[in-house]
């Protein structure tokens, strides 16, 4: 059994950079009620600061159109939908992390598209019109929301241009041209606005180096570096509805190494102090991988949440909701979607893991690859432990003994558990027979799959509490230790022994 003696004082702060941003399906989905219901739930229970998604300039949001005037095609900018979308975000206390993409059809140089909703991934046929579009969009944001507000936003140029699926021919020099035109357009509106890139996925980190040298050589504005991080391998099985992918042997450490690698590249660049934003991360890059619905995903992500903030300025979970349509409209309630929240506002195990980390304090007392222990400002202790199990089979438990110093004698302990049994709506759905389009009754039942709660009162011995904890397979558990402020003596004539079946 592992024994951990938690120090009485922390020497550093727990960096909650995972709260900075969260991902979303294309922005046009924010016009749907269920999308906003999910975002409201996420903001109430977790509270992210920014939200990032594709499709700002795609045709369904409707910003860019061309109309014929006196025989000439001229741009027309329509902000009806984007105003509604951003208004909804701000009302839920979350700001946009703007991604400029994809290409409006009327401005596209080709017809190559990506996703069910056909985001165009070709360069603009007229860079002057593209520049004018960026200026118009940014200027409109400032006019509507005010310069001080928009200066807090971040503007990212495109999405994964190192992949041929997302940028025609994955042409690096063409992307650099797009970035330069876009960044200069943003800064022409206001030099204090924040713009960055190159928003690549893993496997092409030479893009980071080349991008920063390009910006230095041409004096192109760059305020941050962005990259994506996933750790699943190529699928070993594909079906009409699912991708099955193995994770790396030590996936959490692999992802953290990706964070460190990019940070090192930035330090070696002409801009060594630029912020690094991981604008997408998850276990799998596929929106139809069942791992996203599981307790394993929660245990995996717990490790990343515990340490990722030491290496990057933000890391944005992809995504908050299963209202998402890259691979068509979801074909079942649980379909392997990226979201923290499944359809019908049903929290997944990973959602609960995020709420557990949201309960942690700022003072970091202890951390290793399986737990994190913190102290809150009020002196209470909050810890998250996890047992990531990659192998198949039952059992596979882990025992831990924590020796935790406390400054009070009477102690209230609350433990919340998410694992293969508790807080696992995917398990309940499978027990129902995996209903593709569940009945209203089933939809009412599934949200009841909440974390298991255990409580007890103890007295500290010599200023410490000893906790023996057994973690089941893929469990994530939150332990909160607070001082008991006993008011029992204020109840005149109190005697539980007078209640049938109870003793004093």
UniProtKB/Swiss-Prot annotation:
Signal peptide: none annotated. It comes from the Bacteria. It catalyses: Hydrolysis of (1->4)-beta-D-xylans, to remove successive D-xylose residues from the non-reducing termini. InterPro entries: GH39_as, GH39_cat, Glyco_hydro_39, Glycoside_hydrolase_SF, Glycosyl_Hydrolase_39. PROSITE patterns: GLYCOSYL_HYDROL_F39 (PS01027). The active site is at residues 160, 280. One of its GO terms (biological process) is xylan catabolic process. GO terms for molecular function: xylan 1,4-beta-xylosidase activity. It holds the Pfam family Glyco_hydro_39. Keywords: Carbohydrate metabolism, Glycosidase, Hydrolase, Polysaccharide degradation, Xylan degradation. Its EC number is 3.2.1.37. Belongs to the glycosyl hydrolase 39 family. This is Beta-xylosidase. It comes from Geobacillus stearothermophilus (Bacillus stearothermophilus). The gene is xynB.
């Amino acid at each position: 059994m592992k024994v951990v003696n938690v120090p009485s004082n922390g020497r550093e702060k727990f960096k909650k950079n995972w709260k900075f941003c969260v991902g979303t399906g294309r922005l046009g989905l924010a016009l749907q009620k269920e999308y906003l219901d999910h975002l409201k739930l996420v903001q109430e229970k977790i509270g992210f600061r920014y939200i990032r998604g594709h499709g700002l300039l795609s045709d369904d949001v409707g910003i860019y159109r061309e109309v014929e005037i006196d025989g000439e095609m001229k741009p027309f900018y329509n902000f009806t939908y984007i105003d509604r979308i951003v208004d909804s975000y701000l009302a839920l206390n979350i700001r946009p992390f703007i991604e400029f993409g994809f290409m409006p059809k009327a401005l596209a140089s080709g017809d190559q598209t990506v996703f069910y909703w056909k985001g165009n991934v070709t360069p603009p046929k007229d860079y002057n019109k593209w520049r004018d579009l960026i200026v118009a969009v940014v200027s409109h944001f400032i006019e509507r929301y005010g310069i001080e507000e928009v200066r807090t936003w971040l503007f990212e140029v495109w999405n994964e241009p190192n992949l041929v699926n997302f940028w025609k021919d994955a042409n690096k020099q063409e992307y650099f041209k797009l970035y330069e035109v876009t960044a200069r357009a943003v800064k022409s509106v206001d030099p204090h606005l924040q713009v960055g890139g190159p928003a690549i996925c893993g496997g092409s980190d030479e893009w980071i180096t080349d991008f920063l040298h390009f910006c230095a050589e041409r004096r192109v504005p760059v305020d941050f570096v962005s990259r994506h991080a996933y750790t699943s391998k190529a699928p070993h099985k594909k079906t009409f509805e699912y991708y099955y992918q193995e994770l790396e042997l030590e996936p959490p450490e692999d992802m953290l190494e990706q964070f460190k690698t990019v940070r090192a590249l930035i330090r070696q660049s002409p801009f060594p102090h630029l912020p690094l934003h991981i604008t997408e991360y998850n276990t799998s890059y596929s929106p139809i991988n069942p791992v996203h619905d599981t307790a394993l995903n929660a245990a995996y992500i717990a490790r990343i949440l515990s340490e990722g903030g030491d290496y990057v300025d933000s890391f944005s979970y992809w995504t908050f909701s299963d209202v998402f349509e890259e691979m068509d409209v979801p074909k079942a309630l649980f379909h392997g979607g990226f979201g923290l929240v499944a359809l019908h506002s049903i929290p997944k195990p990973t959602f609960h893991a995020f709420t557990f980390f949201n309960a942690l304090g700022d003072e970091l007392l202890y951390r290793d690859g399986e737990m994190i222990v913190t102290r809150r400002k009020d002196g209470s202790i909050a810890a998250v432990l996890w047992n990531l199990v990659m192998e198949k089979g039952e059992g596979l438990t882990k025992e831990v003994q924590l020796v935790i110093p406390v400054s009070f004698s009477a102690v209230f302990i609350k433990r919340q558990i998410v694992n293969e049994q508790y807080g696992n709506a995917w398990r309940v759905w499978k027990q129902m027979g995996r209903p593709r389009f569940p009945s209203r009754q089933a939809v009412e039942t599934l949200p009841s799959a909440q974390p298991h709660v255990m409580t007890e009162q103890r007295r500290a011995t010599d200023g410490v509490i000893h906790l023996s904890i057994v973690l089941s397979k893929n469990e994530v558990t939150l332990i909160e230790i607070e001082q008991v402020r006993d008011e029992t003596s204020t109840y005149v004539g109190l005697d539980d022994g007078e209640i049938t079946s109870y003793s004093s």
